[in-house]
């Protein structure tokens, strides 16, 4: 057993209001520069819908994730070393700019400089790639906002497998959800296995997956290998880039920018301890629907004395273990089993999990589509949203989704009876296997969601990450693991590096 720590994230979809604040702040901080205009490390999609890029969940088309062989081994779906080498100069599984969208801006200056005329001046769109005038904007990262496109296009959503999409049309006005997406920072990242240059690595201290900008050669196999399509090619620098989980903030014990600015308080950050030796075993599980339960088994109890002892022997600091004991991610994913992984069938073991939304169930109940099971809506009676959520979060297994939804409904019914009627309805808790203490904790974390409860992030121990801190002082900033090799003419932000031989004339501030 080799114990490692991972900073994971949980998003409570039941509270997401679709405001896109997380997307805008992430965009302003990380990708508002030439070459990355089309890239959104964090984006919010409206489901059902085909998403961004188009049909990213259709792995028959994009070949993302892993596939299990007959002998029990797993390989990237895009193929082994020889297939990757054969297609290295012409990747057939690569999304084009039209699958994302052509980024644009508007000629706002024309509103100020237009000559006097009989018509009001207009700010027309202009491409940020070619600089040419765009006659028509045809797609965007949130084009399907609030079910904005016709159902004929949205029915291509891969999560409609084994769902009668035609019948779904009856519930179209009551079944909608927001899905914020970012890099999953997987335990078994397919992007790292797909990279011919070996430029993608996973940090041991916090599990964040990064791309070494010095080693990256722009082959773009990682884009095909990632089933979530959260790696983007910077056409200006010729490098691939992705969400870095705001690791400079994480190292300082601060939440990511998307989590810090979330209006709905839907994001939770915390540490999980896991057994790194079992990653291949879990990812090679025969039945795809068993992957969720198998991934739960890989997480270790941070209160177990044997786990604590082994973690210390494996170099996990005590501060990280203490953070894991207070982790909201562990509570929601392992203890309460409310949070579920996004498409575990990709076998990447994702580490950004989601609490399924109650809104489709409650809205349908209010519209009379759902019968009541005592005081709780009968989740089984609304098969379409349940099957859809199962395809999205548990590889089609409906039982974990049903349990999570029933537990959240039970918490609401219990707290309503307690606060409105002044009684404790213990029967509703017994029906879903929860104690009073667990429900009180769930209410505290889900409803009140204080800052210190949502974000439990230990500060990094940088003194243990390098052998000689004095020699590294003022060295090269964010070097991404390969030191100051200087192999690239651009830095991580796409700008040209300064010539170190330039002589800067000093300014004398005082007289001798």
Locate the predicted segments by residue.
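Non-ligating segments of multi-cofactor redox enzymes
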Residues: 1-512
């Amino acid at each position: 057993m080799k114990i490692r720590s991972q900073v994971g994230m949980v998003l409570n979809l039941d509270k997401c209001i679709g405001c896109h604040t997380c997307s805008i702040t992430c965009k302003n901080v990380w990708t508002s520069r030439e070459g990355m205009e089309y890239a959104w490390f964090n984006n919010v999609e409206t489901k059902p819908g085909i998403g961004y890029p188009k049909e990213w969940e259709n792995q028959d088309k994009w070949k993302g994730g892993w596939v299990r062989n007959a002998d029990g081994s797993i390989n990237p779906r895009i193929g082994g070393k020889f297939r990757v080498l054969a297609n290295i100069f012409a990747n057939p599984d690569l999304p084009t700019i039209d699958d994302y969208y052509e980024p644009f801006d508007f000629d706002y200056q024309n509103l100020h400089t237009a000559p006097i005329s009989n018509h009001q001046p207009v700010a027309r769109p202009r491409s940020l790639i070619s600089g040419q005038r765009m006659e028509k904007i045809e797609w965007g990262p949130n084009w399907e906002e609030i079910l904005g496109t016709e159902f004929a296009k949205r029915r291509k959503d891969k999560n409609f497998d084994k769902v009668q999409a035609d019948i779904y049309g009856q519930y179209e006005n009551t079944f909608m959800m927001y899905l914020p997406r970012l890099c999953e920072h997987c335990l078994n990242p397919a992007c790292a296995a797909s990279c011919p240059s070996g430029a993608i690595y996973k940090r041991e201290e916090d599990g964040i997956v990064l791309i070494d900008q010095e080693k990256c050669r722009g082959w773009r196999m990682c884009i095909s290998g990632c089933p979530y399509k959260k790696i983007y090619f910077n056409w200006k620098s010729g490098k691939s880039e992705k969400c870095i989980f705001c690791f400079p903030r994480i190292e300082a014990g601060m939440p990511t920018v998307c989590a810090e600015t979330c209006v709905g308080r839907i994001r939770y950050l915390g540490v999980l301890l896991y057994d790194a030796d079992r990653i291949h075993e879990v990812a090679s599980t025969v039945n795809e629907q068993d992957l969720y339960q198998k991934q739960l088994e890989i997480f270790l109890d941070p209160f177990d004395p044997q786990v604590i002892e082994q973690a210390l022997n494996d170099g996990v600091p005590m501060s990280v273990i203490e953070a894991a004991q207070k982790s909201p991610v562990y509570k929601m994913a392992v203890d309460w089993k409310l949070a579920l992984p996004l498409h575990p069938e990709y076998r990447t073991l994702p580490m950004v999990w989601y609490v399924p939304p109650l809104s489709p169930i409650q809205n349908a109940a209010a519209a009379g589509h759902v019968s009541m099971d005592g005081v709780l809506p009968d989740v089984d009676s609304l098969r379409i949203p349940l099957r859809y959520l199962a395809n999205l979060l548990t590889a089609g297994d409906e039982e974990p989704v049903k349990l999570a939804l029933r537990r959240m409904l039970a918490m609401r019914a219990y707290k309503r009876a307690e606060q409105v009627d002044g009684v404790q309805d213990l029967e509703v808790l017994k029906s879903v296997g929860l104690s009073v203490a667990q429900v009180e904790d769930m209410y505290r974390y889900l409803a009140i969601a204080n800052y210190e409860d949502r974000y439990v992030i230990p500060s990094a121990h940088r003194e243990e990450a390098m052998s000689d801190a004095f020699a590294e002082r003022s060295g090269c900033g964010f070097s991404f693991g390969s030191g100051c090799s200087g192999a690239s003419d651009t830095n991580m932000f796409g700008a040209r590096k300064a010539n170190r031989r330039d002589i800067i004339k000093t300014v004398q501030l005082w007289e001798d």
